[in-house]
């Protein structure tokens, strides 16, 4: 699979990945990791977990990718890697390794896959996880601010009731995700996240955010 080192993509084999993650207690995968700033912050504060950020747009990751290969005294980290891949083509090397998975503030097609559960895509995401791994999806959009995107993708209006509906829970379950909890949250909650996109949302106009969490039940 292709990973980013600085501004260059290099190949990382399954054996090489296995050797690396064997040095850590846990593995966390963040799909649609954006600029990588959020998992970089998490990796700094949790040296026992190996963080894998996945995103198809490598250019957005250059700043953080250049930082993690520096000396530790200059911000370098050994417990984070960025994989260049889209949700539609996840590397087989990542199968069955994650203790937890997150999809935070997705947009575009990834948002659509989560809100209108795409069984093929989400089943492949579930395949990245170990049995009973934890998952967290945090989403937001508003008919007051993103009406065009909602119409373009045929998205439903977001509500806690939508995520708790039997239809949504069943569709997510068919993809391998068992919902344990749904929370409606506000801008203040999002201020803890470090990506530029999250900061833009957190400090922008007032809106609701929905956190769906649970466990992977596919295996």
Swiss-Prot record:
Enzyme class: transferase
BP GO annotations: methylation; response to antibiotic
Lipid metabolism listed as a keyword: no
Substitution effect: residue 88 to A: No change in kanamycin resistance
Pfam families on file: NpmA
Keywords: Antibiotic resistance, Methyltransferase, Plasmid, S-adenosyl-L-methionine, Transferase
Catalyzed reactions: adenosine(1408) in 16S rRNA + S-adenosyl-L-methionine = N(1)-methyladenosine(1408) in 16S rRNA + S-adenosyl-L-homocysteine + H(+)
Residues that, per the record, bind S-adenosyl-L-methionine: 32, 38, 55, 87-88, 104-109, 195-197
Top-level lineage group: Bacteria
Any GO MF annotation of the entry: methyltransferase activity
Effect of residue 177 to A: No change in kanamycin resistance. Decrease in methyltransferase activity
Gene3D superfamilies referenced in this protein's UniProt entry, alphabetically: Vaccinia Virus protein VP39
Outcome of swapping residue 55 to A: Decrease in kanamycin resistance. Decrease in methyltransferase activity
EC number: 2.1.1.180
Transmembrane segments: none
Biological role stated in the UniProt entry: Specifically methylates the N(1) position of adenine 1408 in 16S rRNA. Confers resistance to various aminoglycosides, including kanamycin, neomycin, apramycin, ribostamycin and gentamicin. Methylates only fully assembled 30S subunits.
NCBIfam families linked to this entry: 16S_rRNA_NpmA
Protein family membership: Belongs to the methyltransferase superfamily. Kanamycin-apramycin resistance family.
Name of the protein in its database record: 16S rRNA (adenine(1408)-N(1))-methyltransferase
Species this chain originates from: Escherichia coli
Lineage: Bacteria, Pseudomonadati, Pseudomonadota, Gammaproteobacteria, Enterobacterales
Gene: npmA
């Amino acid at each position: 699979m292709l990973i980013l080192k600085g501004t260059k993509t290099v190949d990382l084999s399954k054996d090489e990945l296995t050797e690396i993650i064997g040095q850590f207690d846990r593995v966390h995968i963040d799909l649609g990791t954006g600029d990588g700033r959020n998992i970089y912050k998490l990796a700094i504060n949790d040296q026992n977990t190996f963080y894998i950020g996945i995103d198809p747009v490598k250019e957005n990751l250059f700043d953080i990718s250049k930082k993690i290969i520096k000396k530790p005294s200059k911000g370098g980290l050994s417990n984070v890697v960025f994989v260049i891949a889209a949700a539609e083509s996840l590397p087989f090397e990542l199968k069955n390794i994650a203790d937890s998975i997150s999809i935070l503030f997705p947009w575009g097609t990834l948002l659509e896959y989560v809100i209108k559960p795409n069984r093929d895509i989400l089943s492949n995401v579930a395949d990245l996880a170990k049995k009973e791994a934890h998952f967290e999806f945090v989403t937001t959009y508003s008919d007051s601010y993103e009406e065009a995107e909602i119409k373009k993708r045929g998205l439903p209006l977001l509500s806690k009731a939508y995520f708790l509906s039997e239809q949504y829970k069943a569709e997510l379950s068919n993809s391998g995700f068992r919902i344990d909890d749904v929370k409606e949250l506000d801008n203040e909650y999002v201020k803890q996240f470090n990506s530029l996109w999250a900061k833009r949302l957190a400090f922008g106009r007032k809106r609701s955010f929905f956190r769906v969490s649970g466990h992977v039940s596919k295996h």
